[in-house]
């Protein structure tokens, strides 16, 4: 039931955006850029967390609680970055699904068989490129979990 409700909300959103001249393909492009930026930000965050961890490995005394708080903060920021990446990729997937559904529906509206075949070819090529992009994004997302798990088990929290 919730999926049906959320799907209709997204459909309403896309319809409203199209009314003001912003098409699903434009939303898709924006969401891909947002996801890529989130991945880059996440990469920076993980690098910062690693640097903080390395500084503790060479720890020679001092305020243990301060160091723990700093490491825990880096870990929490890394978890947030991972969630942001996941959310951005999910948003890309959502608008892409809506775009491809609309495109498929419109194929049945062509009067010309040649134009329909050309649009089907473009749809197939676009889906193929999108699938490669989404696969790469999901692979990058999956690579984050082992880093977080390692950080969690090696005194980052």
What is each stretch, according to the model?
Residues 25, 29-107:
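Early exported N-terminus immediately downstream of N-terminal targeting peptides
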Residues 88-157:
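Extended amphipathic alpha-helical interaction segments
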Residues 10-13:
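Bacterial signal peptide processing site
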Residues 1-2:
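Sec-dependent signal peptide recognition
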Residues 5-8:
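C-terminal motif of bacterial Sec signal peptides marking the signal peptidase cleavage site
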Residues 16, 23, 30, 59, ...:
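Primarily heptad-repeat coiled-coil rod domains in cytosolic scaffolding/tethering proteins
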């Amino acid at each position: 039931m919730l999926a049906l409700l959320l799907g209709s909300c997204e459909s309403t959103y896309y319809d409203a955006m199209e009314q003001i001249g912003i098409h699903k393909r434009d939303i898709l492009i924006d969401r891909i850029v947002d996801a890529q930026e989130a991945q880059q930000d996440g990469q920076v965050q993980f690098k910062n967390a690693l640097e903080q961890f390395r500084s503790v490995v060479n720890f020679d005394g001092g305020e243990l609680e301060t160091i723990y708080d700093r490491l825990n903060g880096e870990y929490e920021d890394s978890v947030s970055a991972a969630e942001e990446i996941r959310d951005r990729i999910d948003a890309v997937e959502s608008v892409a699904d809506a775009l491809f559904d609309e495109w498929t529906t419109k194929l049945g509206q062509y009067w010309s068989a040649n134009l329909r075949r050309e649009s089907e070819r473009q749809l197939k090529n676009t889906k193929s490129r999108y699938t490669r992009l989404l696969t790469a994004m999901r692979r990058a997302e999956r690579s984050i979990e082992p880093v977080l798990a390692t950080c969690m088990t090696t005194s980052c929290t």
